[in-house]
Design a protein with these regions (language model features):
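Conserved class I S-adenosyl-L-methionine
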Residues: 170-200
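Short N-terminal helix/helix-N-cap motif within the alpha/beta-hydrolase-1
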Residues: 105, 149-154
Length: 279
C-alpha cells in the first residue's frame, strides 16, 4: 500500500499545539506521552520492499507443506498486492496463478513483473473473477489481510466460491485484535495493548498527529481494521460453511503453549495460520 504523508508541523504550529495540549483530556495526554514520530514514511523499522525471491517466506513458514500444496495446481492469490507472491508461486511450480486485487496500479505492476519472468499464460492479474473461474481453483491464498476486511463474512464466501469442492483455503494473518499490537499502531508507540488501555476515540485523536487521513474509527484507517480476534475468525469460518483442517497459532516470544489457554490466548496469539476446507 502507498504510505500516507506524515505531519511535520512548523515551529509556530508546534507552539500553538503545545498550548492546546494543556487542555487535552488526561487519556490523550498519557497516550501522547508514550508516542513518537515514525522512523520513516512506512511507519515501520524498515521500508524494504518484498522481492520475488523472498515473497513465499511467510507462507513456507506458516505451512510446512506449502510448495507441495501448490505444485501443479490452479491457485488464486486473493489480495495479491504488487504481485511478487503471485509470480513466486508460479515459479515454485503452480500450474496457473491468478492475482486478484482492486488496485489497478498494483495489478499493472504485477503484469509487468510476470512479463519480466516470462510467465505469460501461467500468471494473470485481475480485479474480478469471471463466472467460469468460480469453483475452479485448487488453492486460494490469503496473506496478512483477514484483519483488515470490514465485511469478512462476504470476503470469506467469495474465497470459498472460487474453490472447487475439494479445494483448500490457506489463510495467514496477524496480529489479531487482542494481540499486543493488534491495533496496528506500533508506528506511533511501542507500548502494547493500547487498544485495551485506551478508548477508540482517544487512540484516533492521538493518531491524527501522525497520520492525516482523517480516520475517526479503526475501520476508517488505511486498509481498515475489523477488530478481528481469534474467536471472531473461528466463528466466521463456521458461519461460512467451512472448517479448520489444520491450524498453527503462533504466540509472542515463541511461547505457543499460551495459545491453548481459554480466553487468555487472545492476548498472546500473534499470528494465525489456518488451512480451511468446506464442511
Amino acid at each position: 500500500m502507498e504510505a500516507l504523508t506524515l505531519i511535520r508541523p512548523h515551529e509556530s504550529e508546534t507552539k500553538i499545539s503545545r498550548q492546546a495540549d494543556r487542555f487535552m483530556p488526561l487519556p490523550e495526554r498519557l497516550l501522547l506521552a508514550i508516542s513518537h514520530q515514525p522512523e520513516n514514511q512506512c511507519g515501520q523499522l524498515s521500508c524494504k520492499e518484498e522481492t520475488v525471491d523472498s515473497a513465499l517466506a511467510l507462507l513456507q513458514h506458516a505451512f510446512n507443506y506449502f510448495e507441495r500444496e501448490i505444485a501443479g495446481k490452479r491457485v488464486l492469490d486473493f489480495g495479491c498486492g504488487y504481485g511478487q507472491q503471485t509470480v513466486a508461486m508460479a515459479k515454485a511450480g503452480a500450474k496457473y496463478v491468478a492475482g486478484l486485487d482492486i488496485n489497478q496500479k498494483f495489478l499493472q505492476r504485477g503484469r509487468d513483473l510476470a512479463a519480466q519472468h516470462d510467465l505469460d499464460g501461467r500468471v494473470e492479474f485481475t480485479d474480478k473473477l469471471d463466472e467460469c473461474q468460480l469453483g475452479s481453483f485448487d488453492v486460494v491464498i490469503s496473506q496478512n489481510s483477514m484483519e483488515h476486511y470490514i465485511q469478512p463474512v462476504e470476503i470469506l464466501k467469495i474465497m470459498k466460491s472460487a474453490l472447487h469442492p475439494a479445494g483448500k483455503l490457506l489463510i495467514t494473518f496477524g496480529p489479531p485484535w487482542f494481540a499486543p499490537y493488534g491495533s496496528h499502531m506500533q508506528f506511533m508507540t511501542r507500548v502494547p495493548w493500547i487498544n485495551l488501555m485506551f478508548g477508540e476515540a482517544t487512540v484516533m485523536k492521538v493518531r491524527q498527529r501522525f497520520r492525516n487521513d482523517g480516520a475517526m474509527k479503526y475501520e476508517e484507517v488505511e486498509g481498515g481494521l475489523a477488530k478481528m480476534s481469534v474467536a471472531k475468525f473461528e466463528r466466521l469460518v463456521l458461519q461460512c460453511g467451512m472448517k479448520i483442517q489444520h491450524k498453527k497459532y503462533e504466540c509472542i516470544k515463541g511461547l505457543d503453549f499460551l495459545g491453548k489457554l481459554p480466553v487468555l490466548r487472545e492476548l498472546f496469539i500473534n499470528h494465525v495460520n489456518c488451512a480451511l476446507v468446506a464442511c
